[in-house]
């Protein structure tokens, strides 16, 4: 492999490891994207998803809106409904707290449970919950209605400027969620972010942490490597 261009030797090694473990068959599951809420308590410097209350028509999608999107996805051949959302917006925004109280929900996580339950019952799509850093009881609640869940580990660095205003982005919180999901035998998607101020060694350390958790519990179904978008103006 000495005559290969930089990187190709690594690709060859990765390919050999993959082929030995799972072969060359590629599987996929079409999914429809359901952004249940774009409000978020975190203030990540790279985020292009979250919006403040003034920029959204409602703090949360209604169950009717969720089902409309899910049915469109089912007609298009989707098998899964990917619930994505900001983390615990009720802790930052009074509008989110008020909406949840008025609609009879204890928290955003409880509303995710209700929305996922409706999608599962009404459309047959398999909900995938991506509600961020959750505690064991919250993971267990969603486990009743979501065959799989996910949360990006992102990084093990606790000193990055982009996470300065993001209480749920501490390595301890993310790792605790990863471990709890494994202990509950929840098929889990995770991964790291590249380009947020971390070093190559930081990326390797984060990937090792994911691999070690999977070695203990066997629950990681996807490990994603996302590149960070340009910072928002």
Regions found by a protein language model. Give the residues of each.
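Short linear capping/connector segments at secondary-structure termini
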Residues: 1, 31, 193-195, 228
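Conserved Radical SAM active-site core
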Residues: 51-212
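Conserved small/polar residues in nucleotide/adenosyl-binding loops
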Residues: 226-233
């Amino acid at each position: 492999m000495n005559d290969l261009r930089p990187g190709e030797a690594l690709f060859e090694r990765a390919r050999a490891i993959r082929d030995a473990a799972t072969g060359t068959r590629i599987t996929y599951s079409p999914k429809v994207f359901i952004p249940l809420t774009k409000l978020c308590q975190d203030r990540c410097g790279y985020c292009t998803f979250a919006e403040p209350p003034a920029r959204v028509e409602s703090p949360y999608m209604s169950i009717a809106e969720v089902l409309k999107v899910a049915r469109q996805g089912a007609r298009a051949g989707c098998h899964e409904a990917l619930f994505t959302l900001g983390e615990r917006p009720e802790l930052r925004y009074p509008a989110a707290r008020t909406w949840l109280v008025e609609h009879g929900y204890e928290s955003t996580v409880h509303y995710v449970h209700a929305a996922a339950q409706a999608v599962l019952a009404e459309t047959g799509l398999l909900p995938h919950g991506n509600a961020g850093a959750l505690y064991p009881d919250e993971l267990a609640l969603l486990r009743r209605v979501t065959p799989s869940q996910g949360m990006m580990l992102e990084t093990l660095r606790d000193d990055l400027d982009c996470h300065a205003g993001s209480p749920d982005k501490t390595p301890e919180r993310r790792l605790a969620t990863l471990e709890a999901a494994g202990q509950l035998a929840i098929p889990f998607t995770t991964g790291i972010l590249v380009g947020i101020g971390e070093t190559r060694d930081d990326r390797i350390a984060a990937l090792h942490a994911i691999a070690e958790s999977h070695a203990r519990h066997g629950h990681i179904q996807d490990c994603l490597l996302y590149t960070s978008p340009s910072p928002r103006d």
